[in-house]
Amino acid sequence: MLGSLAKWLRLLGHDTTYPGPLGDVEIGATAQNEDRVLLTRDRELARRVRGAYRVRSDDLEEQLLDVVRRFSLDLAESMTRCSVCNAELESVRKPQVKGRVPDGVYARQEEFWRCASCGRFYWHGSHWDNVTVRLRRLGVAGAHEDGPPVDESPAPDSRVPPG
């Protein structure tokens, strides 16, 4: 399973889908129909699907480095996608998030982003700092401190109630 790798690729701004409970035939067909590279740990699936790439490591950091290097991924425009559903993020004004993010976050942060699809809110918090540190440790280009965030709120239907 490469769900964690998919989430990290999204955090780095790459359009990345994760198939969920589909069979191999459906996964391969979806990749072909959407002109995507299929990343898989499954040797047989990688052999059967044209253009698939087999990720060999079980370690997330090794997987990330492997894929970034293999496909020469540009990381300059990181955090433009929702880490959960892959939709694009849009900047929102601070008053729009009041009561939808934790009170402390609202008090400390000035910039917020919202997923255009699932409605999650993001901000530049400590999680973004941790991601940046991890990317720098891995030597991944484009690991910078500014830019959109990684901390996130639940989707609006499960949002934090107003204080």
Describe each region flagged by the PLM:
Residues 87-91, 123:
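Short functional micro-motifs and their immediate structural scaffolds
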Residues 82-85, 115-118:
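Short cysteine-rich clusters marking metal-coordination/redox-active sites
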Residues 91-98:
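Active-site/ligand-binding-proximal alpha/beta "capping" segment
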Residues 1-12, 108-111, 124-145:
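Extended interfacial segments that mediate partner engagement and assembly in macromolecular machines
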Residues 99-112:
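Short linker/helix segments within small regulatory modules
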Residues 1-77:
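Long, charged N-terminal interaction/targeting segments
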Residues 142-163:
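Intrinsically disordered, low-complexity terminal tails and inter-domain linkers enriched
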Residues 75-79, 108-111:
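Short metal-coordination and nucleic-acid-contact micro-motifs, chiefly zinc-binding Cys/His arrays
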